[in-house]
Amino acid sequence: GNIRMGVQELLARPLTHPRPALQPRPAIPAPAAPEPGRLMTDAFLMHTLAQVRSRDSIIVEEAPGSRSIIQAHLPIYAAETFFTMCSGGLGHSLPASVGIALAKPDKKVIGVIGDGSAMYAIQALWSAAHLKLPVTYIIVKNRRYAALQDFSRVFGYREGEKVEGTDLPDIDFVALAKGQ
């Protein structure tokens, strides 16, 4: 058969049953603020970001360990305001934020990136600083390469087996950025 003709025929067919319009999700209760001296939760961070960012700002996400929390607490309001990698390529979002800021200079770009993911392409901080781009980076720190640990069984590790080289120290990302 002819693929073009087949697709055209499928598109010409009426829907067999009408699809209802999507309804907005119910609001999720605000997470509790951290107590003094305690670390904030990812949920509190994403909820707070949702409250303070403009609706037309662009989120560039690569925080695989926080993705379900991001989906729950950080609503996306318009097309072309949320970007992420499509197939697990680590190190995408720092440089992607630079590229998106170059492509959309009138928009505020917010990179939400895990600390492990950030280390794959940390030199993008230099590009963002050198080009004076409107990018804000939020580094979600769990002090590990979570994606590698979470997929360790696929790589042949046994349940609970330590994956060498995947724990991170407390990296000072502010100092790294200032060094740019």
Locate the predicted segments by residue.
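Active-site diphosphate/adenylate-binding microenvironment
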Residues: 24-101
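Thiamine diphosphate
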Residues: 1-8, 69-180
